[in-house]
């Protein structure tokens, strides 16, 4: 489990990215890099890290399910993820 402060910081960044999305898009289209530079650093989508919604783990996150590989495996074995079943061949 990740530290609560790290998860909170990531949520704050996500909020800022969503807040400044349209403005950043307009400024980039105009080519106004001076105004872009004055925006908060955390408003850049590059600074976001995909984290597991269950554990907050930053690595090994499956995009489709927004879960880490470990949490995905646990939930899949319990049958808590619809449409997912263990394959065998």
Swiss-Prot record:
Disulfide bonds: none annotated. InterPro entries: Ribosomal_uS14 (IPR001209), Ribosomal_uS14_bac/plastid (IPR023036), Ribosomal_uS14_CS (IPR018271), Ribosomal_uS14_sf (IPR043140). The keyword Transmembrane helix does not apply. It holds the Pfam family Ribosomal_S14. GO terms for molecular function: rRNA binding; structural constituent of ribosome. Keywords: Ribonucleoprotein, Ribosomal protein, RNA-binding, rRNA-binding. Signal peptide: none annotated. GO terms for cellular component: cytoplasm; small ribosomal subunit. The keyword RNA-binding applies. GO terms for biological process: translation. Belongs to the universal ribosomal protein uS14 family. Part of the 30S ribosomal subunit. Contacts proteins S3 and S10. Binds 16S rRNA, required for the assembly of 30S particles and may also be responsible for determining the conformation of the 16S rRNA at the A site. This is Small ribosomal subunit protein uS14A. It comes from Staphylococcus haemolyticus (strain JCSC1435). The lineage of its organism: Bacteria, Bacillati, Bacillota, Bacilli, Bacillales. The gene is rpsN.
């Amino acid at each position: 489990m990740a530290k609560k402060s790290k998860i909170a910081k990531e949520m704050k960044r996500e909020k800022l990215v969503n807040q400044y999305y349209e403005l950043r898009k307009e400024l980039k289209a105009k080519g106004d890099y001076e105004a872009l530079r004055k925006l908060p650093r955390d408003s850049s989508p590059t600074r976001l890290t995909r984290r597991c919604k269950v554990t907050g783990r930053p690595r090994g996150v499956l995009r489709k399910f927004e879960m880490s590989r470990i949490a995905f495996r646990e939930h899949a074995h319990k049958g808590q993820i619809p449409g997912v079943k263990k394959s065998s061949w």
